[in-house]
């Protein structure tokens, strides 16, 4: 539809049906589009104004439905869904593909020596710390100590895993050695994400009814949200870290790379990038962004409170984070 926009579109929700995987994938292909990181501050502020005005019933003359949705997705790409704060540039989901293809490609090219492992795992976990904090659920702030603990623990876990597996794989096929970075990344995700979101595990994340009315905070919802994010992140990294090793193992035996060994890194980065263009939105779409759980799965005191104020309510909803 390209005519003037009707006044009753619910732009608090994505454009596509989020109850289906295809709908969620369409949504995240738009949210993770790397072109969004090229938007200027002026364009983002204009998008925010369009979205906020429309929510208040103010429709600028000449605004079309497609323009409204473009503004909504520009807004969603840069502003946190719970706090409304502008997110750090490299922490936005639209930066995932360019940042991860560079870091992952280098991790998988320079994995044979201890200094290289230390450096690239440190770079990767520094980036992950920014992403995990930027895309946390809810509005609970982390202290400097909590941030530091999460960052140091994840970096230590990733480096220890990588170095330990490097030592174990010295006497096996070089192909197996190429999978060490993936094992390190998977281990680090299991450490970094829960620690970076530890306050949610302590105090809970906001849960609402289907209309967005806040009902309280739930640690059980936080556990479900964080588990889903860990699974998504590991699977997101898998294609880019599992497919290129087979290709590179074959290419490095060819005359071309023997003659031009410096081409190994750019080829690896390109292969990883191609995988991530598809893996990032598809794995974000595995679970609904607006996740839900049964009221009976909540903590006893929150259950009692909800049953008292909303006796007919059966499910609650929450932002799982990304």
Swiss-Prot record:
Gene Ontology terms, MF aspect: L-alanine transmembrane transporter activity; L-serine transmembrane transporter activity; monoatomic ion transmembrane transporter activity; transmembrane transporter activity
GO terms of biological process kind: erythrocyte differentiation; iron ion transport; L-alanine transport; L-serine transport; one-carbon metabolic process; serine import into mitochondrion
Mitochondrial intermembrane-side segments: 121-146, 196-228, 288-322
Positions in the Mitochondrial matrix compartment: 2-102, 168-174, 250-266
Subcellular location(s) of the protein: Mitochondrion inner membrane
Alphabetically ordered keywords of this record: Acetylation, Amino-acid transport, Membrane, Mitochondrion, Mitochondrion inner membrane, One-carbon metabolism, Transmembrane, Transmembrane helix, Transport
Listed transmembrane segments: 103-120, 147-167, 175-195, 229-249, 267-287
UniProt main location, coarse: mitochondrion
Function, in words: Amino acid transporter importing serine, an essential substrate of the mitochondrial branch of the one-carbon pathway, into mitochondria. Mitochondrial serine is then converted to glycine and formate, which exits to the cytosol where it is used to generate the charged folates that serve as one-carbon donors. May also transport other amino acids including alanine and cysteine.
Name of protein: Sideroflexin-1
Source organism of the structure: Rattus norvegicus (Rat)
């Amino acid at each position: 539809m390209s005519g003037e926009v009707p006044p009753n579109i619910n732009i608090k929700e994505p454009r596509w049906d989020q109850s289906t995987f295809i709908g969620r994938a369409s949504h995240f292909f738009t949210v993770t589009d790397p072109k969004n990181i090229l938007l200027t501050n002026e364009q983002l502020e204009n998008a925010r104004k369009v979205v906020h005005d429309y929510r208040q019933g103010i429709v600028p003359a000449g605004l079309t439905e497609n323009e409204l949705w473009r503004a909504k997705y520009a807004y969603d790409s840069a502003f946190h869904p719970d706090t409304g704060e502008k997110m750090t540039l490299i922490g936005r989901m639209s930066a995932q593909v360019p940042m991860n293809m560079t870091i992952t490609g280098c991790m998988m090219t320079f994995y044979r020596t201890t200094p290289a492992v230390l450096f690239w795992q440190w770079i990767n976990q520094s980036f992950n710390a920014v992403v995990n904090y930027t895309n946390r659920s809810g509005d609970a702030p982390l202290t400097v100590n909590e941030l530091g603990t999460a960052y140091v623990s994840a970096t230590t876990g990733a480096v220890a895993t990588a170095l330990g597996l490097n030592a174990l794989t010295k006497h096996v096929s070089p192909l197996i050695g190429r999978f060490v970075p993936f094992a390190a990344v998977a281990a680090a995700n299991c450490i970094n994400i829960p620690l970076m979101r530890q306050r949610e595990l302590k105090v809970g994340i906001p849960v609402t009814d289907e209309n967005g009315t806040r009902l309280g905070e739930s640690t059980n919802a936080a556990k479900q949200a964080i588990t889903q994010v860990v699974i998504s992140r590991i699977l997101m990294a898998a294609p880019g870290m599992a497919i290129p090793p087979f290709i590179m193992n074959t290419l490095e035996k060819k005359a071309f790379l023997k003659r031009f060994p410096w081409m190994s890194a750019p080829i690896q980065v390109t292969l990883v990038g191609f995988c991530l263009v598809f893996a990032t939105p598809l794995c974000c779409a595995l679970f609904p962004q607006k996740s839900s759980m049964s009221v009976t799965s909540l903590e006893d005191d929150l259950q009692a409170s909800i049953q008292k104020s909303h006796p007919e309510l059966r499910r609650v909803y929450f932002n799982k984070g990304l």
